[in-house]
Amino acid sequence: MPTFSREEIVHLGDLARIALTDEEITRLQGELNVIADSINKVQEVASDDVPPTANPVPLEAYLRPDVAETPLTQEEALAGGPKTEAGMFVAPRILGSEE
């Protein structure tokens, strides 16, 4: 039964460039050990006579009929937006500042 040491948790945090507090390290150590135990239990149950599967229910992609339709005009498309200018949607700035 593999367990994650504090040093391994710190190393994982360093690899992810995440600064972890002592409390977070302790919590993650417990959580990752529970996950590892769960994976080990599944591996114990899995046997050679059970075929591997990604999904127990076979799913088929539903494709709608490929029918040519008239696209929206620019005016129709812009009518769905709250604010437009010069034929484009106007959205609030989220990065940087105006210079």
From Swiss-Prot:
It is an enzyme of class 6 (ligase). Pfam families: GatC (PF02686). InterPro entries: Asp/Glu-ADT_sf_sub_c, GatC. Its EC number is 6.3.5.-. Keywords: ATP-binding, Ligase, Nucleotide-binding, Protein biosynthesis. GO terms for biological process: glutaminyl-tRNAGln biosynthesis via transamidation; regulation of translational fidelity; translation. It catalyses: L-glutamyl-tRNA(Gln) + L-glutamine + ATP + H2O = L-glutaminyl-tRNA(Gln) + L-glutamate + ADP + phosphate + H(+); L-aspartyl-tRNA(Asn) + L-glutamine + ATP + H2O = L-asparaginyl-tRNA(Asn) + L-glutamate + ADP + phosphate + 2 H(+). Disulfide bonds: none annotated. One of its GO terms (molecular function) is ATP binding. Allows the formation of correctly charged Asn-tRNA(Asn) or Gln-tRNA(Gln) through the transamidation of misacylated Asp-tRNA(Asn) or Glu-tRNA(Gln) in organisms which lack either or both of asparaginyl-tRNA or glutaminyl-tRNA synthetases. The reaction takes place in the presence of glutamine and ATP through an activated phospho-Asp-tRNA(Asn) or phospho-Glu-tRNA(Gln). Heterotrimer of A, B and C subunits. Belongs to the GatC family. This is Aspartyl/glutamyl-tRNA(Asn/Gln) amidotransferase subunit C.
